[in-house]
Amino acid sequence: MAARLCCQLDPARDVLCLRPVGAESRGRPFSGPLGTLPSPSSSAVPADHGAHLSLRGLPVCAFSSAGPCALRFTFARRMETTVNAHQVLPKVLHKRTLGLSAMSTTDLEAYFKDCVFKDWEELGEEIRLKVFVLGGCRHKLVCSPAPCNFFTSA
């Protein structure tokens, strides 16, 4: 069973953030504020980095009690096709990092909710989840598969 994460948008930074959903929440997303995101230059990860969780392909900071670094990520299977992915998602995300016009934040949020979490949480396909850090996170991946080139298709 995959670890449950809450996906939240940080409009100030225009990034998606992952936060672990605690057992006390019974699977519901956090109702509190987004909280303080760690600085991309920070390399310290608290001891409770969540190595006991069964999730693969996420940086260790994703399980930090202080919250993960800002992440942009996608689902590997969706990257391999243009079906259900507006304008090929990796290119869209790259344009956004350069400040160019691309998919709206609302469209991105809908994409991740519909494509990522449906397949990941409901179907249990967490092994296929890939994380692409486009903004300075230097943490190592947990149980990382072979390196993946962000700009090439599988």
Curated annotation (Swiss-Prot):
Location in the cell: Host cytoplasm; Host nucleus; Host mitochondrion
Assigned keywords, A-Z: Activation of host NF-kappa-B by virus, Activator, Apoptosis, Host cytoplasm, Host G2/M cell cycle arrest by virus, Host mitochondrion, Host nucleus, Host-virus interaction, Modulation of host cell cycle by virus, Transcription, Transcription regulation
A single BP term in Gene Ontology: viral genome replication
GO cellular component terms listed in the entry, alphabetical order: host cell mitochondrion; host cell nucleus
Record PTM: A fraction may be phosphorylated in insect cells and HepG2 cells, a human hepatoblastoma cell line. Phosphorylated in vitro by host protein kinase C or mitogen-activated protein kinase. N-acetylated in insect cells.
Domain of life: Viruses
Region (Mitochondrial targeting sequence): 68-117
Quaternary structure note: May form homodimer. May interact with host CEBPA, CFLAR, CREB1, DDB1, E4F1, HBXIP, HSPD1/HSP60, NFKBIA, POLR2E and SMAD4. Interacts with host SMC5-SMC6 complex and induces its degradation. Interacts with host TRPC4AP; leading to prevent ubiquitination of TRPC4AP. Interacts with host PLSCR1; this interaction promotes ubiquitination and degradation of HBx and impairs HBx-mediated cell proliferation.
Family of this protein: Belongs to the orthohepadnavirus protein X family.
Known role: Multifunctional protein that plays a role in silencing host antiviral defenses and promoting viral transcription. Does not seem to be essential for HBV infection. May be directly involved in development of cirrhosis and liver cancer (hepatocellular carcinoma). Most of cytosolic activities involve modulation of cytosolic calcium. The effect on apoptosis is controversial depending on the cell types in which the studies have been conducted. May induce apoptosis by localizing in mitochondria and causing loss of mitochondrial membrane potential.
Name of the protein: Protein X
Natural source organism: Hepatitis B virus genotype C subtype ayw (isolate China/Tibet127/2002)
UniProt lineage: Viruses, Riboviria, Pararnavirae, Artverviricota, Revtraviricetes
Name of the coding gene: X
